[in-house]
């Protein structure tokens, strides 16, 4: 959805999807 960079790195995207991080680097 919002984090479509999962192709590059899913790790930094996980916390964003869970709602822990305001925005992935």
From Swiss-Prot:
Transmembrane segments: none annotated. GO terms for biological process: defense response to bacterium; defense response to fungus; killing of cells of another organism. It comes from the Eukaryota. Keywords: Antibiotic, Antimicrobial, Fungicide, Lipid-binding, Plant defense, Transport. One of its GO terms (molecular function) is lipid binding. Seeds (at protein level). Plant non-specific lipid-transfer proteins transfer phospholipids as well as galactolipids across membranes. May play a role in wax or cutin deposition in the cell walls of expanding epidermal cells and certain secretory tissues. Has antibacterial and antifungal activity. Displays antibacterial activity towards both Gram-negative bacteria, P.carotovorum (IC(50)=11.5 uM) and P.syringae (IC(50)=12.0 uM), and Gram-positive bacterium C.michiganensis subsp michiganense (IC(50)=11.2 uM). Belongs to the plant LTP family. This is Non-specific lipid-transfer protein 3. It comes from Nigella sativa (Black cumin).
